[in-house]
Amino acid sequence: MVDGKATRQKLITWDPAKTEPPPAPVDGEWEVCYVAVQDFHTMSLVFDWLNTGRHPFRSVVIDSLTEVQKRCKDQVAGLATLSDREWGDLLIKMEHLVRYYRDLVFHPQHPIECVTFLALTEEKKGIMKPAIQGALSISLPGYVDLEGYLFVEETADGPVRKLLITPFTSANPPHTQYQAKDRTHVLTVKYGSFVSNPDIEEMLKIKEEGETNG
């Protein structure tokens, strides 16, 4: 719902600085609500609306956390190089953002079913991980139930989208490691290390059933 590119689904736009959230769709008139994030303050505005519970949304996708951090840097230091104190401010703001959005799934009146953070990927010391600067790159995995690495695998039947959900090291040199984790363990039991053509609604259903059955 926040930033990212338009999808093939029915799309509407929303400016949280000007209006309240759109009414619930009637007869499938819209499926995705898109918010253009041009400054970090917009992220706070969206959260404030979501936290009221007075909205029609079931899920939130932030695309991408890498870009949101850049917007946060713009707010903290503009075009200047970040000082040590400003790096600290950046970490606090970004950690608050991640945790506050994540906690929307526990909202007492209108819990969000799923909050998804997308990010670009970069290699750090031989490990492929989210392209997030500073200490947040270390703490981020601890804030979420699932950290995955999404890629496309070419097969005889054509390209297949796959989501890695457990740590993995490539067999060929330079033996790159891929950072991933499934804190629920339920998804790993169902899919193994890779989810082919991942469907978030299906994965949520499996997670909920696994947690219910213990």
Description of each model-found segment:
Residues M1-V61, T66-E67:
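Conserved P-loop
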Residues V2, V60-I62, Y101, E147, ...:
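Generic structural hydrophobic/aromatic packing signal, biased to beta-strands
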Residues W49, E67-R71, Y143, E147-L150:
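Conserved, well-folded catalytic cores of nucleic-acid-processing
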Residues S59-S139:
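P-loop NTPase motor core
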Residues Y191-G214:
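Glycine- and charge-rich intrinsically disordered segments
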